[in-house]
C-alpha cells in the first residue's frame, strides 16, 4: 500500500512526469513502476492519457480518478495517524528518560 500511496501522491503533484522520471523520483525500477501504474489503472484509480509533447513524440499524462483521489485521501489520513502515534510514543519515551535523570 505504501507503493500505491507514493505513486498516487506523486501523480497528483505532477501528472505530466514521464515514467522514467517518476520511477527515478520514487526510487523504483521502471518495470516496478510500470506494473504499479497498470495495477492502479486496472483498479480504476488512475487514467493514462496520451498527449503530444512535440511534433514527433507522444507522452502520457497520469490523472487520478475520483476513486483515486478518495483512496489517496484515505491513505494520507492513515499515514498521518500513524505518524502522530509514533510522535506521541516518542514523546512519552522521552518524558520517561527525562524523569529518570
Q: Where are these predicted regions, by residue range?
A:
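Key DNA-contact positions within bacterial/archaeal DNA-binding proteins
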Residues: 20, 31
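Amphipathic alpha-helical dimerization/coiled-coil segments
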Residues: 71-101
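Alpha-helical residues within the helix-turn-helix
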Residues: 24, 42
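Short, cationic-aromatic polyanion-contact patches
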Residues: 1-3, 18, 49-73
Amino acid at each position: 500500500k505504501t507503493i500505491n500511496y507514493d505513486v498516487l501522491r506523486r501523480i497528483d503533484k505532477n501528472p505530466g512526469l514521464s515514467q522514467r522520471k517518476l520511477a527515478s523520483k520514487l526510487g523504483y525500477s521502471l518495470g516496478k513502476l510500470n506494473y504499479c501504474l497498470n495495477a492502479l489503472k486496472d483498479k480504476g484509480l488512475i487514467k493514462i492519457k496520451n498527449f503530444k509533447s512535440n511534433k514527433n513524440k507522444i507522452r502520457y499524462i497520469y490523472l487520478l480518478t475520483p476513486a483515486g483521489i478518495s483512496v489517496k485521501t484515505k491513505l494520507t489520513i492513515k499515514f498521518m495517524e500513524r505518524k502522530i502515534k509514533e510522535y506521541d510514543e516518542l514523546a512519552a519515551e522521552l518524558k520517561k528518560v527525562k524523569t529518570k535523570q
